[in-house]
């Protein structure tokens, strides 16, 4: 009788090992169904598929503009929507924006510059 119990326990352990090796474990990683959220320095994370929404126009890279920005402030406007219409403006005005267009905006006192000609274009705010 004791041999039968020991034999049953050993068989049960071997069966669990065999099934455990074939079944996926609870620690397996699966691809995420939701889009990855980009990290922002101000406010909550926003999904990268959303473009131009949020309290400050969102600081992530939009798919159609393909632009990158560097800012010294805690939040900045970088959106095709909203009051600033696609021009990146940071709170401290120390920001450089690079895009695939021919223009760079230097908001640190700067004016509008052409990437190709490397000369300053006429700034409508300082036209005399």
Swiss-Prot record:
Residues 115-128 have a biased composition (Basic and acidic residues). The gene is INF56. Residues 27-36, 87-101 have a biased composition (Polar residues). This is Infection structure-specific protein 56. General role in the development of germlings including formation of the infection structures. Residues 27-48, 86-128 are annotated as: Disordered.
